[in-house]
Structures are given as C-alpha cells and as structure tokens.
From Swiss-Prot:
InterPro entries: Ara_Isoase_C, AraA_central, AraA_N, AraA_N_sf, Fuc/Ara_isomerase_C, Fucose_isomerase_N/cen_sf, Lara_isomerase
This protein's UniProt keywords: Arabinose catabolism, Carbohydrate metabolism, Isomerase, Manganese, Metal-binding
Protein name per Swiss-Prot or TrEMBL: L-arabinose isomerase
Binding site for Mn(2+): E306, E333, H350, H450
Key word Manganese present: yes
Enzyme class: isomerase
Molecular function via GO: L-arabinose isomerase activity; manganese ion binding
Comment on bound cofactor: Binds 1 Mn(2+) ion per subunit.
Pathway given in the UniProt record: Carbohydrate degradation; L-arabinose degradation via L-ribulose; D-xylulose 5-phosphate from L-arabinose (bacterial route): step 1/3
Catalytic activity field: beta-L-arabinopyranose = L-ribulose
Source species, domain of life: Bacteria
Length: 500
C-alpha cells in the first residue's frame, strides 16, 4: 500500500518586502538547502515542495486557495525565517482547509559568537517571527501544529514524519467511502452512531448495501479465478489436512476464495476502502467471510464486525498512518481475561477477523473449522499469534454531542501457553497501567468492545489526528489514575457543551 507516493507537503516561507531583494534571496537560498536536506536525508514519508516566497497578504491568500484545490497537497509547512507580520496571514489562514505545521527552526544551529552582527540578527529572526505567526493562529482559534528544533535534528525529522502521516490520514478520511454489507447487529448500542455527523466531522461517507448486491458479484466469480487464488493461498500459508487437495473441507476453502474475489471486486468497483459485515446478515453467502476479511485488511482495507462502521473507518485511517512502518494494525476485540496476581492479561481476538499484518508467524495456518454463530457452513480462517512489543488499542465512539477517540497503551506479550483448541488468531497483552485501572477507565469512558489494535502507530499520531478534527482525545497509559481520568471526562463535558 503506497499512499504517500502521489502526495506532497508545501514548504512555505513567509517574510516581507522591507528586507530588500538581497536578504529575501538569501532566505530562499537557505530554504532550498533545508528542503533538499529534508527530502534526501530525513526519511520523511511525503515529499516537501518548496513554494515561492510569500511577502504580501494577496500572495498568502492565493497560495492557501491553491493548496485547498490541489489534491496532491496534503498540508502546508511554514517557516518564519524572518519576521512576517501576522495580519498578512489572516485572509489565507481563514480559508485554508489543509493541515498546517509551523516548523520553528532556524538555518544556523549555533550562534556564531565572534562574527554575529545586526545583519545576521535581521536575517535569522525565527525566534520572534515564529511567535508572531503563532499568535495569529491562537487568536483565530485555528488548529495548527508546532515543531521546534534544528532542521538537521533527528527528533525534529521524526516529528515532521509523524505529522505528515497524520495529514495524509486526514486527507484519506475526507475521501474515504465505507460500505456496510447488511446492517448493525441487532440491539447492539456502541456500533451505532450518527453517520451524518461523522461525514461532517471527518469527511467519510458510510452507506449500506444489501447482501444480495454482494452475492451477485460473488456468484459471478469464475472457477479459473478461484483456482488461481487458491494457488496463492498454497504459496503463502500452511494448510491443515482438511483444506489440502482432497481434504474434507477443501470445498469450504474454495467457497472462501470465491467470497474474497467477489468482495474485492465489489469494493474496487465502488471505490470503497473500508467495509463492515454482520453474521446476522449472510443470506446467499455460504459462510461468514473470515479469510476474505483478513486478507483485505492486510491489503490496507478498514473493517468492522457487526456493522461497526466507526471502527472500520478508523482502521483504514490507521492503516494509512502506519504505511511503511514496522508492525501491523488490525481489527480487534477484548475477548477474555487472565486474572492472576502479577500477570493479569487480556486475550484479544474475534470470531475470525484478525489481520495477518500482526502475525508473528511468517506463514499463518489456514484452516476450516466450525463456527457456532451465523448458521452457515464452516468458514476458512488464518490462525496465528502476535509478537511481543508495544502496542495500543483505539476506539472511536459517538457521544452524541461529540466524537471521542479513546486510546489504551498496552504491552503485547508472547503467548505464554499453547492454545491447541482455539481456532482463531489472537493477541495477548498487558494493559497499562494495570488491567483493573485500564478496564475501569475504558468502561467509564464508554469505550467500545471493538478496537483498532496497532503495533505500528503511536499515541502521538492519534492525539494529533484528534486535534486536526477537533474531537475529544482520552488516553489510558502508565500515568493514568482513575480520579484524574474521571475529572478529565467531567471537564471535557463542560468544554464540548460550551464549544458547540
């Protein structure tokens, strides 16, 4: 999944004409060097494009208007090399609808103590030029990010890269289409929500399709295409005897391949990058899509079970954020606990649908086994465990007057014992700060039982994503205490009531 290749971030230098052509030319010469260095040496996921110097209100407004309509531009990164009076930026910033990053840097890393004169001081004015720019952002109540550090500093590079990933995720959010096969699982509350409010807030559209629409595409898949896909399965996974050629569940595997091909074509034809299924709405399908969903998630699609469109959209957004990073991202559900002093654990899984991007095994096991829910034939699925390491669980919930993004930092552990009778993929983790505190805080905050589990994306990216969209962000980690967490929820309730 290469979502960054066609994207760019515009690097914009603000100044004013009173400095004269010689100084302004030096500013642009320095900017060229900074941009070339960042593009070639910083490992940024998105290309920086240096734009012409802006020195007047009209130039700034024209540039912001152009950025809004350029589909390749996912955001603007500003540098106040000199002093740029911020009233000049009001018109442009008031219409800008792309993410904005202020890079508070300067060309020189250290002060040239022996040679510094007033010419040097006038040229290198980030220290106060950046504050002027920051004031107008604060005065306009406009969300914008600030990163401070020298342009050759690796920590600054990392933070710029994080911002770029989130800016790309916001762009994806604004054009994302989510398909719901069937409706919500009956009587379930948290998977419901205001789809119109979500489209206004995030940009993505959510629409439902009858299972018959999908079945028609599935039934049209040819035997030749099925055989080709099964050959891919055989090269990619370990097979149990039941699904090998002449195995007693071989036909179930062929049916699963047919469903995958049909779902893929339906999603591609409709331009969908996320989808949901529901085991209560399977009319016309021979089995619950398990293998198909797992493989589609690995290809970058978002997914939510039981009609959970919010989790499906969030999963796709995290897939975009985590592109090219180590670790995977998957649909997940807190399934069962291990209550043991000093070793409290959570087993995360789902009926079938866990993404192989988080698999520890190089070749997951492909099997067909009974599923006692849904009333259909035994479904195919990939079975694997998850490697140890840092991770998080994220949940997007509709609170009525706002959306809340809830995140719990967890530590994934190696599976402590074999699970010979558990025929599904799983992850096992220790919740921060403890299972008791994490679970109580999650429940108090109304967190869903479905989550997005990621070993690729971190807390900083998700906090920034929430800031870019103006939604609530709550974090449960090693610093969390329940009294403080409850107070934060109370304060947030007041803020969002007043900030309608």
């Amino acid at each position: 999944m290469d979502v960054f290749k066609q994207s760019e971030v515009w690097f914009v230098i603000g100044s004013q004409n009173l400095y004269g052509p010689k100084t302004l030319q030096q500013v642009m010469d320095n900017a060229h060097q900074v941009v070339n260095s960042l593009n070639n040496e910083a490992g940024l996921p998105v290309k920086l494009v240096l734009k012409p110097l802006v020195t007047t209100p009209d130039e700034i407004t024209a540039l912001c208007r152009e950025a809004n309509y350029d589909t390749a531009c996912i955001g603007i990164m500003t540098w106040l090399h000199t002093f740029s009076p911020a009233k000049m930026w009001i018109g442009g910033l008031s219409i800008l609808n792309k993410p904005l990053l202020q890079f508070h840097t300067q060309f020189n890393a250290q002060i040239p103590w022996k040679t510094m004169d007033m010419d040097f001081m006038n040229l290198n004015q980030t220290a106060h030029g950046g504050r002027e720019f920051g004031f107008i952002g604060a005065r306009m109540r406009q969300q914008h990010s600030v990163i401070t550090g020298h342009w050759q500093d690796k920590e600054a590079h990392q933070r710029i890269g994080q911002w770029m990933r989130v800016a790309a995720a916001k762009q994806e959010s604004q054009q994302l289409k989510v398909a719901r096969f069937g409706d919500n699982m009956r009587e379930v509350a948290v998977t419901e929500g205001d789809k119109v409010a979500a489209q206004i807030q995030f940009g993505y559209s959510v629409n439902a399709y009858g299972i018959g629409d999908l079945v028609a595409v599935v039934d049209a898949v040819s035997k030749g295409d099925i055989d080709t896909l099964v050959e891919e399965y055989e090269a990619t996974y370990r097979f149990t005897d039941a699904v090998k050629l002449n195995g007693d569940k071989r036909e179930n595997l062929l049916d699963a391949a047919r469903i995958e091909l049909g779902m893929t074509r339906f999603l591609e034809q409709g331009g969908f990058k996320a989808f949901t299924t529901n085991f209560e709405n399977l009319y016309g399908l021979k089995q619950l899509p398990g293998l198909a969903v797992q493989r589609l998630m690995q290809q970058g699609y978002g997914f939510g079970g039981e009609g959970d469109w919010k989790t499906a959209a969030l999963l796709r957004i995290l897939k975009v954020m985590g592109t090219g990073l180590k670790g995977g991202t998957s649909f997940m559900e807190d399934y069962t606990y291990n209550f043991q002093p000093g070793n409290d654990l959570v087993v995360g899984s789902h009926m079938l649908e866990v993404c192989p991007s988080i698999a520890k095994e190089e070749k997951p096991l492909l099997d067909v086994q009974h599923l006692g829910i849904g009333g259909k034939a035994d479904p195919a699925r990939l079975i694997f465990s998850t490697p140890a390491g840092p991770a998080l669980n994220a949940s997007l919930i509709d609170m009525g007057n706002r959306f809340r993004l809830l995140v719990n930092v967890v530590d994934t552990v190696e599976q402590p014992h074999p699970l010979p009778k558990l025929p599904v993929a799983r992850a096992i983790w220790q919740a921060q700060p403890s299972l008791a505190t994490a679970a109580e805080a999650w429940i108090i905050a109304g967190g869903a039982h479905h989550t997005v589990f990621s070993q690729a994306v971190g807390v900083d990216e998700l906090r920034l994503y929430a800031e870019m969209h103006g939604i609530e962000f709550l974090l449960i980690d090693n610093d969390t205490t329940l009294p403080a967490f409850k107070n934060e929820i109370r304060w947030n309730e007041v803020y969002y009531q007043l900030n309608r």
